[in-house]
Amino acid sequence: MIRVAIPTGRMLEQALDFLRNFDDRLLDEEKGRKLRIHGERFEVFLAKPWDLPLYVEERVVDLGIIGRDVIWEQEKNVVNLISLPFGYCKMVIAGYPYVSLKGNGKEIRIATKYENITKKLLENRWGKIKIIKLNGSVELGPILNISDLIVDIVETGKTLRDNGLEVKEVLFESSACLISNVVSFAYLRKEILSFVKEVRKLNDKCN
């Protein structure tokens, strides 16, 4: 049986529905009461999104389903197997309409939970940036005037608009992806590659 971690939160239902395409023994009634769901093919663990890559890296589980944005931010030593047809979102720079992306030599304050991504993508462009690491609602950065801009993922942009903010630039698009532990990929190579082949067929049907 392959151990799979899926993220709690916005992608939970999508990830479970996705896995049910390959294991119909993953029952709904177990969800909500347990952090572990037993199927015929998979043993599924529900994990916080930001903890999930660590569980895969440390081989607590064999596979994980997580947003590509989290993988790029954390840079864990895992095998990135294939993109999945859900969890679509965009990594954006956002701020109040009157705030310019041109720093004009001034330090730009950026609130984000994606500290590494922000540094890699924007430090060379603007030079003088101050990253304010927030773990909660990064929209509070501009609202409380502790940042000029934010870098965050958005799906519809409604939360930004509700708080008077707008998308200034899309940095990249993200979706869910399937990742594997390095050792598990070696020892369970046949089973994992067979699963990836099935996933690829499902992806083709969705496109």
From Swiss-Prot:
PROSITE patterns: ATP_P_PHORIBOSYLTR. Its EC number is 2.4.2.17. Pathway: Amino-acid biosynthesis; L-histidine biosynthesis; L-histidine from 5-phospho-alpha-D-ribose 1-diphosphate: step 1/9. Its main location: cytoplasm. The keyword Transmembrane does not apply. It is an enzyme of class 2 (transferase). One of its GO terms (cellular component) is cytoplasm. Gene3D superfamilies: Periplasmic binding protein-like II. Pfam families: HisG. Coiled coil: none annotated. Disulfide bonds: none annotated. It catalyses: 1-(5-phospho-beta-D-ribosyl)-ATP + diphosphate = 5-phospho-alpha-D-ribose 1-diphosphate + ATP. Lacks the C-terminal regulatory region which is replaced by HisZ. Belongs to the ATP phosphoribosyltransferase family. Short subfamily. Heteromultimer composed of HisG and HisZ subunits. This is ATP phosphoribosyltransferase. It comes from Dictyoglomus turgidum (strain DSM 6724 / Z-1310).
